[in-house]
Amino acid sequence: IQERFNYNCVTQTMEFMSGEDILRLDPISQIDTLYLEGHKMIPYGTRFLEVLYQSSEFSLLIDHKRKMKEDGKIGAMGIKTQNGVQNVDHRSLGIDYRQGWERGVDLYTYEDETSYWLKTRRKMKRFRDVKSLYKILPDKKPMIESYVEEHRTVFSTPDEVLELLKCCM
């Protein structure tokens, strides 16, 4: 099937356009693989993971996730404000969080909660930072420490995490 898909990192769902409607791809259990702009996506539980690297030794997958934080409300004359009492959470009422975009004002900020999955010998282990990587690879801790210090590895950059794992695995 050739469709225009989009992965929603807030809801962790695969979406596509059907006319003017945005539809969610469901059930995902019947899907093997999707390709988005050259990125290989595979179903895992109720969400999709991006396959960044695969080899006989290990695979590195990315769990793209964003947390939506309310940044403010539209006040007088369309200006964003945080003043006043907040009685209603629009999300709890099912109101589309994209409504603010139509007015050119984004009422939300998004916090990155992306994590990685390391697959070795059919076992999947999740990590977000160097401390959680130490826990799943305790025997490689000295090598990881040395590499991270020397290369100043940033865990929010998937390619840097991949290079670290290639060196230490």
Residue ranges of each PLM-predicted region?
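Long, compositionally biased interface segments
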Residues: 124-169
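Aromatic-patch recognition
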Residues: 1-125
